[in-house]
Amino acid sequence: MNQSNCMVAQSGGPTAAINASLAGVISGIKKSGKYDTCYGAINGILGILNERYLNLSQMIPDEKTLNRLKVTPAMYLGSCRHKLPDYKDDDSAYVFIFNQFVKLNIKAFFYIGGNDSMDTVLKLSDYAAKIKSDIRIIGVPKTIDNDLCMIDHTPGFGSAAKYIASTMLEIAHDTFIYAVKSVTIVEIMGRDAGWLTAASALARNDYNTAPHFIYLPEVAFDKEQFLTDIRNKLKTLNNVIVAVSEGIRDKNGDYITASKAVADQFGHQQLSGAGKALEFLVKENIGVKVRSIEINVLQRCASHLASATDQSEAFALGEHAVLLAEEGVTASMVTLTRTSNTPYAVAYDHAPIRGIANEAKSIPREWINAHGNDIRQELYNYLYPLIQGEVSLTYQNGVPVYMPVPHLKPDHVS
C-alpha cells in the first residue's frame, strides 16, 4: 500500500443521480488501486472545515452496496451552500482545508455539484496553485437546472426531466375527465434557465397536446399576451395546461412572483409563486376554474422514476473523474459531449474549471418559438434521448429500498 488517499464531497441541490456520480467515484477508486482510503466529507466543504468524514472504502464494501447507493435519491454525504471567501481577503479556511488534506494524505479531491460547487472547485484550485500543492482537484457536474457550461447536459437533469414529463402527462389525464372550462398552471424549477420547464413538452404524444403553452426565463413574460394565449386556447379546448418556469421575468427583468424573494449566500433569489401569481391573473381576468401546481422538490428526488441514461452517465462521469486525477489533471471539471443523437452516444472528457464556474447556459433563443410560448423541434430532439430507460429498484413493504443516512443526523458522531 502506498498510503495515499482521496476525498469526495457533494454540495448544492440534490438530484436523483448525484449518488450515481458518488458511486462512480468510489468504483473508479477501487479499480484504480492507487488510493488506500476514500474519505467522504459530510455536508460538502463544511465537512472538511468541521472535520466530519466517512470512510467510504469501508462503508461501500461491495457491488450490492454500490448499486444501492447508485439509485438512492438526494445526497448520501449531505450538502451545504457555503461560499468560500476569496483567499486574498481571508485565507484561514483554505489553510485549514489544505492542512486537513495533508493530515489525511489526500492526493485527489472530487467535488460533486452545480454552479456554486464549481466556484468552490475554482477557488480551491487557485489556492492549490498558489501554495504549489500537488493535490488534484476535480469537479464532477450535477444540476437538475442543466445550466452548467462546457457540457452537453448535466447529470440529474435527465431524471428530473423524465419526472416532469411523466407528471405532466398524468396531470393531463386528470383534466381530461372534466367537461368544464379550466386552466391548470404547473410551476417548474428554473431560476435563470428553462431547460426543466421545456422538458414538459416530452409529455406530448399522439393523443395529448399538453402542455399547451410553455413559458421560460429566456423570453420576457408579457401578462397581456399570456391572457390572450389562454383565451384563444379556451375557444377550442375545455382544459388548458400551462408549464411555467419559477424564474420568468417581465421586460424590466422583474420576477413574476406572488411573494417577495429572498437571497442565499451566493446571491441567488429563492423564488416561489410564479404559478400562484398566474393563477390569480387568470382568475381575475378570465374567470374560469383555475389551479396552480408547484412540483417543488419532487422533481429533484424522484429516484423511482429516474432515467437510466441519466444514471449511467452520472456513474461514468464519476469514474472518469478518477481517471483524470490519475493522469495528473487538476483545476478541471469532467464533461461529456454528445457525439450522435441518432443513435444517441456521448464521449467523456474534461474542461478547465475557470471557463465553467460562475457561468450559466441558457436555452438558445432559436430553440424557442417566435411567440415565446412553446419550444421548437430542435429542443425536443435535444431533450428526448436524456429521459430514455428505466431504473430497476429493490422494494420492501411496497416502497423502494435506499441507503440509510444515519451520519446526517445532528447527533451522529463521525
Task: Give residue spans per PLM region.
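Gly-rich Lys/Arg/Thr-decorated short loops/hinges at beta-loop-alpha junctions or inter-strand turns
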Residues: 2-8, 69-83, 142-152, 179-182, ...
